[in-house]
A protein has these predicted regions:
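Active-site nucleotide/adenylate-binding loops and adjacent lid/helix of ATP-dependent enzymes
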Residues: 2, 79-84, 92-191, 254, ...
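Extreme N-terminal starter segment of soluble prokaryotic enzymes
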Residues: 4-10
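Short hydrophobic segments within beta-strands
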Residues: 10-12, 196
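Conserved N-proximal alpha/beta basic substrate-recognition cap immediately N-terminal to
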Residues: 14-117
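Short glycine-rich anion-binding loops that position phosphate/pyrophosphate groups of nucleotides
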Residues: 59-62, 143-144, 292
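Protein kinase-like catalytic core scaffold
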Residues: 137, 189, 201-202, 272, ...
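Phosphate-binding site of ATP-dependent enzymes
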Residues: 151-263
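C-terminal active-site "lid" helix and adjoining low-complexity regulatory extension at the edge
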Residues: 250-251, 264-271, 278-323
Length: 323
């Protein structure tokens, strides 16, 4: 794809349903942009899009939707854009960080922000001799996304049995994380903060009802709970669960906001969604850092604005700075 010299913006994406509200706003504003669909794409050394700004909205969970080639292609594309000196929002370093839950844990540890104790492994038998192994625990993929392939386990034998029966759990990168189980009230839920730059866009409380797919996009979790989401990821723990609920969180604790800003700044993220939960014993535990932020319009409207308009404002500000 050879872009017009007049092109301002290229949006890299894999799931158009998530990005359509932003595309609608960009169209309304007349911004000269192109959509770069990562599901079926090709580039050569000299034909990358020539735009002043690139906005990476690739998702680590693409493999869950059967799109195993999206992430490797995106990494190659972002690396080439970096070498060419392109201006990329959430570029190669940020995307690589989002792909690695163990790197996120390391960052939280560096910042002295409470996080789940975690062990990364490529063979269940490597866990047997560890003195820091404890159960119950959560099994998660190193490359996560959309709450995919998460399981609560009560013993190492249960882990062995699960992996023997479901070898696909090793996908996509053959690495898994065994993480401290954090009790919390699913009827109270978790908190997600959305950031543009280092500034808070909004915070919301997500009542999980025991579900793991907490994707805020209305394409995944519709406002009308009777509708089925387009990107539902069923799991054994979710069969009888009620739909996820999303609420504006107007009383975000100052310390939680401070920690969120620390993470965004330290990881050099342009756009971010950061999640934490509170345990019965008073811990505030940060456990998930997202660069592909799927915004929820009704939450923004509860704060008095359209969040996709704010993203467009952010992109236009960035365009001004790279003239």
């Amino acid at each position: 794809m050879v872009a017009s010299p007049a092109l301002d913006l290229v949006v890299l994406f894999e799931n158009e349903a998530w990005q359509q509200p932003l595309f609608d706003v960009l169209d309304q504003r007349g911004i000269a942009y192109e959509k770069y669909d990562l599901k079926s794409a090709a580039f050569g050394g000299h034909d990358l899009p020539k735009a002043r700004l690139y906005f990476n909205q690739a998702s680590p969970s693409a493999y869950v939707r059967g799109r195993l080639r999206v992430v490797p292609f995106t990494l190659a594309l972002l690396k080439n854009l970096q070498i060419q000196g392109a201006e990329v929002l959430n570029g190669i370093d940020v995307f690589s960080f989002e792909l690695s839950k163990s790197a996120q844990i390391a960052k939280l540890n560096e910042l002295e922000i409470d996080h789940p104790r975690s062990i990364i492994f490529n063979d269940a038998e490597a866990l047997a001799g560890r003195n820091d192994l404890s159960f119950p625990a959560m099994l998660k993929p190193e490359q996560g996304g959309s709450g995919a392939r998460m399981n609560q386990l009560d013993s190492l034998d249960e882990l062995r049995e699960l992996l023997a029966k479901n070898p696909n759990l090793w996908e996509p990168d053959q690495l898994l994380l065994l993480q401290e189980y954090l009790p919390h009230d699913p009827e109270v839920g978790i908190v997600r903060m959305e950031f543009l730059g280092e500034e808070l866009l909004y915070a919301m409380r997500i009542v999980t009802h025991g579900r793991f797919n907490l994707c805020p996009s209305e394409a995944c979790n519709p406002v009308e709970a009777v509708k089925e989401g387009a990107c539902a990821i069923p799991g054994p723990q979710e069969i009888d669960a009620r739909p996820v609920e999303f609420y504006p969180y107007l009383d975000l604790p100052a310390e939680a906001l401070k920690a969120g800003k620390q993470i965004v700044k330290s990881a050099k993220m342009d756009v971010a969604g950061i999640e934490y939960l509170e345990t019965p014993d008073g811990r505030r535990v940060f456990y998930d850092i997202n660069a592909n932020s799927n915004l929820r319009k009704p939450i923004g409207e509860a704060f008095g604005f359209d969040p996709f308009e704010r993203v467009a404002d952010f992109l236009e500000q960035k365009l001004q700075s790279v003239r």
